[in-house]
Amino acid sequence: MLIAAWAQSPAVGAEPAAGRVLQAAGIAINVDLPDSEFTGGPQPLLAWIKRSADIVAHYYGRFPTRELRVTVIPTGGSGVHGGTTFGRYGGYIRVRVGRETADAQLVEDWVLVHEMIHLALPDVGENHSWLSEGISTYVEGIARAQMGNRTIEDVWSEQMRSMPKGLPQAGDRGLDNTHTWGRTYWGGALFCLQADIEIRRRTHGRYGLEDALRAVNRESGGIVVDWPIERVFKVGDAAVGVAVLEDLYAKAKDAPLSPDLDALWRELGIESQAEGMRFHDDAPLAGERKAIMKGS
């Protein structure tokens, strides 16, 4: 979940006290962590924060912000129970973690990677939250797979199951005007998938979506600044040399854009079978499929 850089709310509270400094992904992360609240102690949680930062830094070519504060809030039970990202303090994440969370649950967690990805994009405003949430939803699995934290099969399986949630329903008025959960998260992710494929196709594999996102992050500095969404797409397209983002946005912002997902999976060479995922390397977009998970 992303909260605008300027937002004030009771949930934010007073400025957090940084309990320790963790060196990770080339930056110093100030971590507020009540050690005694967690049965496993602080080390698994610190390793989780470092691992998540390394995953995001690998995808973006560097960590998205120059500094970061993370507050770990203890909750009942086990598992990671959600997080919120702010543009304050140069980048600030509050994440809720169960007191009895096991190491294995932290290794498999997606929440903190999702939140750290939010740091990379300028604040584009609430009407365009589909872009920030869509990027985080789409990039999380790919970035983790590139670092061996998740299998490629699992990522494509989730996309096949969940991308239909992002398709427009009756009464849809485009991504900028339809603020349902499905359109915000998976509609945004579907936009990213389409853009990623098209960038790779039109540049003959030279560039991918990550190159556009890296350029946006480098020029803006990420969540700490406000940008109009049009500037995001202009900078991203300039970096890859093709106007994919601007063209796709023009089609999807004010009207329902509903790609044929079954046809898309066939072109990518992805098939879900009872025994697991099967990949067809003779499919028309098999090269683009492999490149997405390999990265640049």
Q: Regions from the language model: what does each represent?
A:
Residues 1-5:
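Bacterial N-terminal signal peptides
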Residues 7-14:
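Boundary at the C-terminal end of the N-terminal hydrophobic targeting segment
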Residues 12, 222-296:
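Beta/coil-rich, acidic/histidine-enriched accessory regions frequently appended to metallopeptidases
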Residues 18-124, 128:
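Juxtacatalytic substrate-recognition/specificity segment
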Residues 39-51, 102-107, 126, 130, ...:
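Soluble non-cytosolic domains of exported or imported proteins
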Residues 54-62, 118-121, 141-148, 196-204, ...:
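Sec-exported extracytoplasmic/periplasmic mature domains
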Residues 59-72, 123-129, 147-155, 206-212, ...:
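Surface-exposed patches in mature extracellular/periplasmic domains of secreted proteins
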Residues 106, 125-196, 201-203, 209, ...:
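Acidic/His/Gly-enriched intrinsically disordered linker/tail segments
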